[in-house]
């Protein structure tokens, strides 16, 4: 199968985030996103974009990108540089499903409605950046997911 034909036959999924201090909740989001299609693209916030939102990443973009690329659910990592790039990404990568955490419900509906399926996934209970680091619950599953 040619790469061009494969692009059109595969169900393509995209998600966005900073994925700084990667934890089990992130791994679960990526696993569930991958289950929704054949090819998962992660748009990773650049250091500059994070700074524009008033956030400073603990790990650099390149370090976070390397960690995400090591996760078996992730097929491609691309930079997220602006809020408005989502529409362009949908077209450029032939996206079928846009996936993000349910804390963003409604935020991107107007921008993406009719262009692709929009899926808001619930947060993993008791896990997340808000609960602090390190997140120990489910650590073995997270470690296993890092091995391709």
Question: Language-model features: where?
Answer:
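Nucleotidyltransferase catalytic core that binds NTPs
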Residues: 2-148
């Amino acid at each position: 199968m040619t790469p061009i034909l494969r692009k059109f036959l595969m169900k393509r999924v995209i998600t966005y985030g900073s994925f700084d201090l990667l934890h089990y909740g992130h791994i679960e989001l990526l696993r569930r996103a991958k289950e929704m299609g054949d090819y998962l693209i992660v748009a990773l916030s650049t250091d500059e974009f994070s700074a524009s939102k008033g956030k400073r990443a603990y790990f650099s973009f390149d370090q976070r990108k390397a960690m995400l690329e090591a996760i078996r659910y992730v097929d491609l990592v691309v930079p997220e540089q602006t809020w408005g790039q989502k529409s362009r990404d949908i077209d450029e990568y032939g996206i079928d499903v846009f996936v993000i955490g349910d804390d963003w419900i409604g935020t991107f509906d107007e921008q993406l409605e009719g262009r692709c399926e929009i899926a808001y996934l619930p947060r993993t209970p008791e896990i997340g950046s808000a609960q602090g680091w390190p997140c120990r619950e489910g650590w073995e599953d997270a470690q296993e997911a890092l091995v391709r």
